[in-house]
């Protein structure tokens, strides 16, 4: 399975995966074979940043 391309759908997908799997974004990126920096940039592009206190993008 690939990560969604649309940034808003990607946000929902990533937050769901982080919650369900209990992993960090870098681990998720590695699992899906994507560069963490690109994932981070795509989500920052729509105004979301990772909050490690709750393990999600807000």
Regions found by a protein language model. Name each.
Residues 1-24:
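N-terminal acidic leader/helix
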Residues 28-29:
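Short alpha-helical "recognition helix" segments of helix-turn-helix
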Residues 35-49:
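Short acidic, Pro/Gly- and aromatic-enriched capping/linker segments at domain boundaries
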Residues 52:
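Short, acidic, Ser/Thr-enriched surface-loop or helix-capping motifs
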């Amino acid at each position: 399975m690939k990560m969604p391309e649309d940034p808003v759908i990607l946000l929902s997908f990533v937050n769901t995966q982080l919650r369900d799997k209990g992993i960090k974004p870098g681990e998720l990126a590695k699992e899906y074979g994507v560069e963490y920096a690109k994932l981070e940039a795509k989500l920052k592009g729509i105004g979301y940043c990772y909050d490690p206190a709750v393990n999600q993008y807000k």
